[in-house]
Amino acid sequence: MANKPVKKVVLAYSGGLDTSIILKWLQTEYGAEVVTFTADLGQGEEIEPARAKALAAGVKPENIFIEDVREEFVRDYVFPMFRANTVYEGQYLLGTSIARPLIAKKQIEIARKVGADAVSHGATGKGNDQVRFELGYYALEPDIHVIAPWREWDFKSREALLDFAEKHQIQIAKDKRGEAPFSVDANLLHSSSEGKVLEDPAVEAPEFVHMRTIAPEDAPDKPHIFTLDFERGDAVAIDGVAMSPATILTKLNELGHDNGVGRLDLVENRFVGMKSRGVYETPGGTILLAAHRGIESITLDRGSMHLKDELMPKYASLVYNGFWFSPEREMLQAAIDYSQAKVAGQVRVKLYKGNVSIIGRTSPYSLYDQDLVTFEEGKVAYDHRDAGGFIKLNALRLRVLAKRDKR
């Protein structure tokens, strides 16, 4: 139940059943004026219907905010994360995690604009998203009041939730009276499916779960080869055609979809302490990660590459756990961005039945010296005898240890 007076609240609103119920609950339980924010993150569905639904629920026209944030999402969140080659627990490309800070930021901006004293979200009390949203809110507006309905209301079952919806004339799709087969989240970077039929980690996910990719075995028998250009660590062109960040990711998603690239079935460790199984599709991101590592392989020196690889798991955990606006993430970002100054050039990519292969790399800043590495007689002076002293110095501690152990 409501325990603090709230005059105006900004709700992250999708227009779906759950956030429509939350909207009405905020009005009835808090007596608050509700402001809705709906973001177009490239989730692949129309967002304008959210306006009509909010109006039907009694939200004033001036309190309905709908914004296309796809370019900002990719430019300021996805690309910075990919400069770090960010992967959580060796597999997850953080498609859901990276979207939450942007939504939280927009809610706080709107709250300041309209004079709202609270913000609200539709994340459940078991998942990571509640943490991500709220850490974002507090980092940007430390005294904001946060309403998390799933942790507050008294509904004991889904039936009770649907009864509330019917009582308040909230439209319910016919299939909502039964259990939905799984829960879906989507944006321009990925789609995720969790829960219900996917909760048993021993059971293979049904094919219909996959929305962003065709099955690899159904992909074309001929590989697709293209080029991806980079500047300062960010992709800027496909096949020589310059594109905006969101357009590039959209095109990579299309290429990945058509070639069965980017499917992932994993069990991850949630920040809140439990394990969860998810089926993820990140076609464009999977291609982008492989290509970025490809261009880094010829433009970064060994020390920089290895340090980045050491820092990456920490960076990934910060993003996954909701600390995007933390000083430590910004410190890591500064180091990563510094490393990308000369990460520029072109990568040739081959897609074939779910696989991404890097088959060529060129850069004006390449550190690869063909004359130095050739097995033929090189033009660069390299005395093979020098390696003997190098090996002996590196072996010194091993020899000392071996002598001690033989005593």
Swiss-Prot record:
L-citrulline binds at Y92, S97, N128, R132, S183, S192, E268, Y280. Keywords: Amino-acid biosynthesis, Arginine biosynthesis, ATP-binding, Cytoplasm, Ligase, Nucleotide-binding. ATP binds at A12, Y13, S14, G15, G16, L17, D18, T19, S20, A39, G122. Its EC number is 6.3.4.5. L-aspartate binds at T124, N128, D129. CDD domains: ASS (cd01999). GO terms for molecular function: argininosuccinate synthase activity; ATP binding. GO terms for biological process: argininosuccinate metabolic process; L-arginine biosynthetic process; urea cycle. It catalyses: L-citrulline + L-aspartate + ATP = 2-(N(omega)-L-arginino)succinate + AMP + diphosphate + H(+). One of its GO terms (cellular component) is cytoplasm. Pathway: Amino-acid biosynthesis; L-arginine biosynthesis; L-arginine from L-ornithine and carbamoyl phosphate: step 2/3. InterPro entries: Arginosuc_syn_C (IPR048268), Arginosuc_syn_N (IPR048267), Arginosuc_synth (IPR001518), Arginosuc_synth_CS (IPR018223), Arginosuc_synth_type_1_subfam (IPR023434), AS_cat/multimer_dom_body (IPR024074), Rossmann-like_a/b/a_fold (IPR014729). Belongs to the argininosuccinate synthase family. Type 1 subfamily. Homotetramer. This is Argininosuccinate synthase. It comes from Caulobacter sp. (strain K31).
